[in-house]
Amino acid sequence: MIRFEIHGDNLTITDAIRNYIEEKIGKLERYFNDVPNAVAHVKVKTYSNSATKIEVTIPLKNVTLRAEERNDDLYAGIDLINNKLERQVRKYKTRINRKSRDRGDQEVFVAELQEMQETQVDNDAYDDNEIEIIRSKEFSLKPMDSEEAVLQMNLLGHDFFVFIDRETDGTSIVYRRKDGKYGLIQTSEQ
């Protein structure tokens, strides 16, 4: 079951908004053979020009679903977010099923909550001579091949992705090059 943590910036999350988000995004459960035990982190922010920004992150065992949308209408924005997340799930499941058939495995796409922690660095001690890290994230690396890592990177909308390479058991990084192609950095211990 997907549980929801919904937070509003400059906006009070009413029962109507909460119910609409839970109803729309909760429909993602139909894409799973076993309903995942996950927490959907939803952040809704309003701006002075009445525009809203909706961010949804659902960390699962094998993939992190993430979508962001800006819209003048909150409910239309939620609908667009739901469409983006559904496309991500369908794309990921298609790729996994294709890989399973190619390998002869009978893998089932099962999603569970992964532990993810974000910490914000205190900005009070800013010094022009120091390098300032403004955000720090901690997450567990998952074993996968480079193709899966590129898919995960694209699903998250990032320009790079760090993972444990199944073939080498080492930490690797895939990244999007300026020419639109992908690069792979493999690490080794010295």
Swiss-Prot record:
It comes from the Bacteria. Keywords: Cytoplasm, Translation regulation. Transmembrane segments: none annotated. Gene3D superfamilies: Ribosome hibernation promotion factor-like (3.30.160.100), Sigma 54 modulation/S30EA ribosomal protein, C-terminal domain (3.30.505.50). InterPro entries: HPF/YfiA_ribosome-assoc, HPF_long/plastid, RHF-like, RHF/RaiA, Ribosom_S30AE_C, Ribosom_S30AE_C_sf. It holds the Pfam family Ribosomal_S30AE. SUPFAM superfamilies: Ribosome binding protein Y (YfiA homologue). It is found in: Cytoplasm. GO terms for biological process: negative regulation of translational elongation. One of its GO terms (molecular function) is ribosomal small subunit binding. GO terms for cellular component: cytosolic small ribosomal subunit. Interacts with 100S ribosomes. Required for dimerization of active 70S ribosomes into 100S ribosomes in stationary phase; 100S ribosomes are translationally inactive and sometimes present during exponential growth. NCBIfam families: yfiA. This is Ribosome hibernation promotion factor. It comes from Staphylococcus aureus (strain COL). The lineage of its organism: Bacteria, Bacillati, Bacillota, Bacilli, Bacillales.
